[in-house]
Every structure is written in C-alpha cells, then in structure tokens.
Amino acid sequence: RCGKVLADRLMRMYSRVTVAERKESARAQAEAFGFDSVPFPLLPHLQKYGKEYAYIFNTVPKKVLTSKELENVSGEVTIIDIASRPGGTDFEYCRANKMNAVQALGLPGKYAPKRSAEVLMKVIEQHIN
C-alpha cells in the first residue's frame, strides 16, 4: 500500500518511477498508471540499468537489495528502505561502500501510508535542494 502511494507522489513530482513487482498483473496495473515496471529478481534489470537510478525505495521486508544488486547501482544513488524489520537492504554493504542509504524501517506502520509518503517527499525535497 505504501509503495503505491509513494510511487504516485513521486510521479506527481515529475519523477520517472519504476515499480518492481512479482506478479505480472501487478506490473500491468503499474504500467496502466504510467509507471515503468520490472519483475523480481532485480539483478538482471539492475545489471543493465542500475547506474541510471538516483533513488531507490524499498518496501519489501526481506533482502531484495543484496550486495549483488547494490554493486550494480551508482555510488551516488540514495536508497531509502521503509520496509518492516529487518528491511530489504544490505546496509552493511552500503556502509562499507559509502553509499547513501537511509533506514526508515517500519515507517508505514508508524504512520498511515499516505502520511509516510508525505514524510519521504520532504526528505527527498531537502536532499534535492
């Protein structure tokens, strides 16, 4: 739920948004709303396009951004993980490689999904400005 709200808010800020979904029907729905979509696992996509991402948001509470995925993204990327604990990002790898990664684990559970997206937008706007 939070991922959908977040994707919508990012698109309203004129961002190009790519949504990763396991189910083909969910990817089709994302594309119907104007988002790009990719299937899990992410590695094949990131090997080809990973350096193009400025921001990566994770809402999956299991490791989907492991060292294998992260070595294929730009060192300039900002990763924001809002999944429930334990999160889905290898933060040890991020620290060791001086990647900008924010742990906001469980944020949607602490606030409503809409409010969480608004909070994240403020963080992004501060980072951009």
Where are these regions (language model features)?
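Aromatic pocket-lining residues of Rossmann-like dinucleotide-binding sites
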Residues: 6-10
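NAD(P)-binding Rossmann-fold cofactor-contacting core
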Residues: 12-34
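Hydrophobic/small residue at the entry helix of a nucleotide-binding pocket
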Residues: 1-3
